[in-house]
Structure formats: C-alpha cells, structure tokens
C-alpha cells in the first residue's frame, strides 16, 4: 500500500521508508527523506482523516489557495517563503493530494527544518508567542478572498 502511495509523487532520488512523526490528533503524519546526489531532503507525508474532512478536494483547494497567498505576501515583505508558510508538493499528476485505491487520501509537504510544533503550552511565553503568530497569520490573510474557501467541516 505505501509503495502505491509513494509512487504517486515524482521523487528526485531514493525515498526512505516513511516513519510516524509528531503527535497529531487528526491526520496520520509521517516523515520521509529523499536522498540524491545533491543531498538529503525531508518531507512530511500525511494521510488525511476523511472521517473529519469529508471533502479532501475542497480542503486541499483551501490549503493551496491560502499557502500560495501567504507565500506571495512573504515575498513582498522580503521573508523566506519556504519558511513563512507550508508548501504542498504536487503529485506526479500535478494534484495537491493522491487518492489511493482503498480511498485513503494523502498529501505531501516540504519539511520545514529547525521548527517546532508545541502540543501543549509550557509557559506564558509559549502562549504569548502562539498568540503573536496567530495574530500575524490573521493579519496576513486580511485581504484573502474568504468567499473562495470551502466549508470543510460543515456546521463546525
């Protein structure tokens, strides 16, 4: 099964076996490494929880739209777009996700090195920095055309 999933992307090198990554509560997340003559590059592979997100196409359209928008904002302010927002790696068919033969849906992101994802606030400073990051995120999206977003969890 995993071979089918990995074959859906064009990898520039040899692909390691995906290993579980992080402590996510919704999607199943894996890290993998692609090694080539140019070196090693890490990626995040996620199995989308389609019990929660029943419209994976709409979900991925939202994610791609928002991250493309944020990437342009990052470029405009001189920030590194590779660190400023997630980057969805398209499949070999140029789709933002792959639906496997069993119906499961998978996506790949570039791994953003030297970052952390807190599962729980440990200090007031953690809470403050999380609030600052969320405020910046909201500010950057102020001009985003919200009417284009799909409702991915109805009545949530």
Regions from the PLM with identified roles:
Residues 17-35, 39-156:
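Conserved ATP-binding subdomain of kinase catalytic cores across diverse folds
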Residues 1-19, 70:
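Juxta-kinase regulatory segment immediately upstream of eukaryotic protein kinase catalytic domains
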């Amino acid at each position: 099964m995993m071979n089918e999933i990995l074959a859906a992307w064009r990898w520039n090198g040899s692909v390691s076996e995906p290993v579980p990554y992080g402590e996510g509560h919704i999607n199943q997340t894996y890290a993998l490494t692609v090694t080539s003559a140019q070196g090693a590059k890490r990626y995040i592979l996620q199995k989308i929880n389609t019990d929660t997100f029943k419209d994976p196409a709409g979900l991925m359209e939202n994610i791609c739209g928002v991250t493309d928008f944020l990437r342009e904002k990052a470029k405009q302010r001189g920030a590194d777009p590779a660190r400023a927002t997630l980057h969805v790696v398209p499949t070999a068919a140029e789709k933002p996700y792959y639906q496997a033969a069993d119906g499961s849906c998978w996506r790949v992101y570039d791994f953003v090195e030297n970052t952390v994802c807190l599962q729980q606030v440990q200090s007031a400073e953690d809470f403050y920095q999380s609030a600052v990051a969320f405020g910046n995120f909201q500010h950057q999206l102020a001009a985003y055309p919200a009417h284009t977003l799909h409702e991915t969890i109805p009545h949530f």
